């Protein structure tokens, strides 16, 4: 399963860990993904999606209608 948010489209980014001695080590910064079951009222069913914490915050404000459009 890919590490991409369904709603925001966030995906892993690459960069460097920099130590106190200024040594650079390549690393992969993962999005803060969570698997959630969400009730879609229009379709009267549960949907299992992987969302970032920011996407869950957006959904709590706007509702599940936006997610339902993306899943169709």
From Swiss-Prot:
Keywords: Ribonucleoprotein, Ribosomal protein. One of its GO terms (cellular component) is ribonucleoprotein complex. It comes from the Bacteria. It holds the Pfam family Ribosomal_L28. GO terms for molecular function: structural constituent of ribosome. One of its GO terms (biological process) is translation. Belongs to the bacterial ribosomal protein bL28 family. This is Large ribosomal subunit protein bL28.
């Amino acid at each position: 399963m890919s590490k991409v948010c369904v709603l925001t489209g966030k995906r892993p980014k690459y960069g460097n860990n920099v130590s106190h001695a200024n040594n650079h080590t390549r690393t992969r910064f993962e999005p803060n993904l969570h698997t959630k079951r969400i009730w879609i009222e229009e379709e009267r069913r549960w949907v299992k999606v992987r969302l970032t914490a920011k996407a869950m915050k957006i959904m709590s404000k706007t509702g599940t209608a936006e997610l339902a459009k993306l899943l169709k």
